[in-house]
Swiss-Prot record:
This is Large ribosomal subunit protein uL24. GO terms for molecular function: rRNA binding; structural constituent of ribosome. Belongs to the universal ribosomal protein uL24 family. Part of the 50S ribosomal subunit. NCBIfam families: rplX_A_E. The keyword rRNA-binding applies. GO terms for biological process: translation. One of two assembly initiator proteins, it binds directly to the 5'-end of the 23S rRNA, where it nucleates assembly of the 50S subunit. Located at the polypeptide exit tunnel on the outside of the subunit. One of its GO terms (cellular component) is large ribosomal subunit. It holds the Pfam family KOW. SUPFAM superfamilies: Translation proteins SH3-like domain. InterPro entries: KOW, Rib_uL2_dom2, Ribosomal_uL24_CS, Ribosomal_uL24_euk/arc, Ribosomal_uL24_KOW, Translation_prot_SH3-like_sf.
Length: 121
């Protein structure tokens, strides 16, 4: 994920054309103080099932589980952060992962546990 250029247009081009395995890394969010002390890691990529607190925007302060991670649009969808359309249906509000804080990790995946152990040192 090395990008040498400082030019904004090349930074944007990299974001638009990034492959999925690099997009996943760019979907990282900071951990809460308790998790940071426990795992000795500052941030992790957000996954479905993680519990997050929204720190910025209209839904600031809301907490909920991540329902969907949209790598194409660089957005996540959180339970409780919904909008009502004019026809009455509820839709999830897209939130950038930098605007949330992970407060509870989904550790069902063994590979994720190994990643956390490896990064913790």
């Amino acid at each position: 994920m090395r990008l040498n250029s400082k030019q904004p247009r090349k930074q944007r081009k990299f974001l638009y054309n990034a492959p999925l395995h690099l997009r996943q890394k760019m979907m990282a969010a900071p951990l809460s103080k308790e998790l940071r002390e426990k795992y000795k890691i500052r941030n992790l990529p957000v996954r479905v099932g993680d519990k997050v607190r929204i720190m910025r925007g209209d839904f600031k302060g809301h907490e909920g589980k991540v329902v969907e991670v949209d790598l194409k649009r660089y957005r996540i969808y959180v339970e409780g952060a919904t909008l009502r359309k004019t026809n009455g249906t509820e839709v999830f509000y897209p939130i950038h992962p930098s605007n949330v804080m992970i407060i509870e990790l989904n550790l069902d995946d063994e590979r994720r546990k190994k990643i956390i152990e490896r990064r913790a040192g």
